[in-house]
Amino acid sequence: MRDVDSIRVGTRGSALAKTQTEWVVAHIQQQGIAVEIIEVSTRGDLRGDIPIRQIGSDGVFVRELELALQTGRIDAAVHSLKDLPTILTEGLSLAIIPERATPYDVLVGKTARTLATLPTGSCVGTSSVRREMLLRLERPDLVVKPIRGNVDTRLKNLDAGSCDAIMLAGAGLDRLGLGGRITEILAPPRFWPAVGQGALVIQVRTDDDVTKSKLQFLNHATTHLEIMAERTCLASLAGGCLVPIGALATHAGQELTLGACILEERDGSIRKIEVTLSTSSSLVQGLSSEQKATNLGRMVAARLIEEGALEMLASMRAAEGKQALSG
């Protein structure tokens, strides 16, 4: 019989997912709480040879974990926050967001160590449309190759010569103890990361106050506010985790700043619009920290919309619809 005072924590089966979950579990166990780790396979893991966009819809790395939560198989699920859709599953809560690791994209070069020193025609591998567009905007002379697989697989393929460099999230390399492979950090305003990149989230059932209370010590208030701003911006644009939108919120003292960009490819060229605002604006004075974060997200989204973001999104969705029909 299961110990009713223990917590069953669900995780994906990849090395990175298990490392992230083990970090969470170690902190829970330090509080004297027993933990059982339950591995759950997701659609994104099972179809690792297919580009994410071709699998279809947001949430390909989280749906099965959410189902395990809903059915009571697990009490909490550990996710990479950037994998979560902007529309939350009913009855589930993003209750706990630990302190964020580095949010930046990075380059791992085989010989050349930076984008600037890669020779013309070099091949760069990435699994992200956002990264691909930002890369092509900066170096249109490079060849972009879609890659899938876990971090270790990508590094082995790079070492075997499949590409001259790869782009991925720096946090994943750091968490796996592979930060030494990073040859260049790609930060804003050149490269805006995915919404929530570098952050973990512990998802629980909304009505499970007991588990939420036990795990509350892991919540990092500053990170939580930054994520609220980023996800509010994304939701206001009706974007999902597969849409080429980048955003990053940062704190300096009591001031929260949010920058975001949206990218579109049309007629072979990449268009990028970006906006940066902060809570020093008179429009958010006198509000609570949470209200400031969400209002800031809406304000940045509104500015992007003024610059043409909705038209760009509509154009992308129309193009995707045509591809689906032709496929």
Question: Regions from the language model: what does each represent?
Answer:
Residues 8-10, 77, 95, 125, ...:
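Short, well-ordered beta-strand segments
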Residues 58, 75-80, 164-169:
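Paired acidic/hydrophobic, glycine-rich loop segments that form the ligand-binding mouth/hinge
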Residues 81-84, 88-142:
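A conserved helix-loop-strand patch within extracytoplasmic ligand-binding domains
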Residues 2-47, 52-54, 137-327:
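Small-molecule-sensing regulatory modules
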Residues 68-70, 79, 84-89, 297:
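Extracytoplasmic loops/domains of multi-pass membrane proteins
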Residues 50-76:
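Short, structured active-site "lid" loops
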Residues 15-27, 57-61, 86, 123, ...:
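N-terminal winged-helix
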Residues 72, 77-83, 197, 203-208:
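Ordered, amphipathic secondary-structure segments that act as subunit-interaction surfaces
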